[in-house]
Swiss-Prot record:
The lineage of its organism: Eukaryota, Metazoa, Chordata, Craniata, Vertebrata. It comes from Xenopus tropicalis. The keyword Transferase does not apply. This is Transmembrane protein 203. Pfam families: Tmemb_185A (PF10269). The gene is tmem203. InterPro entries: TM_Fragile-X-F-assoc (IPR019396).
Length: 136
């Protein structure tokens, strides 16, 4: 079951550019992960492998700020605030998950159990289910 680009834009709340940006980050992350797993880049740290995700989150936040300012200037304040809160909630949960996962991979500490690491993803999935029900 594949979604069209229009459905992804409606459900996620991201613009097409932001979706492309996150797909690009996933592609670069996958290449870096494969290089580390195959031993071609053994000295590369996990923080360096996660840089594409961090960069995509930062650029998406910057894009959201620009769109919010433009919506405020056009007089669509309610839509601007709702979009800002939604996107920042998604990006912050995604960022917390990435940081916790990267910290677990680097340190291998027992204090970071996988239930704690996955909790932002579970919250994000619940929010996406609620948004999917509201969109349709």
């Amino acid at each position: 079951m594949l979604f069209s680009l229009l459905e992804l834009v409606q459900w996620l709340g991201f613009a097409q550019l932001e979706i492309f940006l996150h797909i690009w980050a996933l592609l670069v992350f996958t290449v870096l992960l494969a290089l580390k797993a195959d031993g071609f880049a053994p000295d590369m740290s996990w923080w360096n492998i996660f840089i594409p995700f961090f960069t995509a989150d930062g650029l998406s936040t910057y894009f959201t700020t620009i769109v919010t300012v433009r919506l405020f200037q056009d007089g669509e304040k309610r839509q601007a605030v709702l979009r800002l809160f939604w996107i920042l909630t998604i990006l912050s949960l995604k960022f917390v998950f990435e940081m916790l996962l990267c910290q677990k991979l680097v340190e291998q500490s027992r204090e970071l159990w996988f239930g704690l690491i996955m909790s932002p993803v579970f919250i994000l999935l619940q929010l996406l289910m609620i948004r999917a029900c509201r969109v349709n």
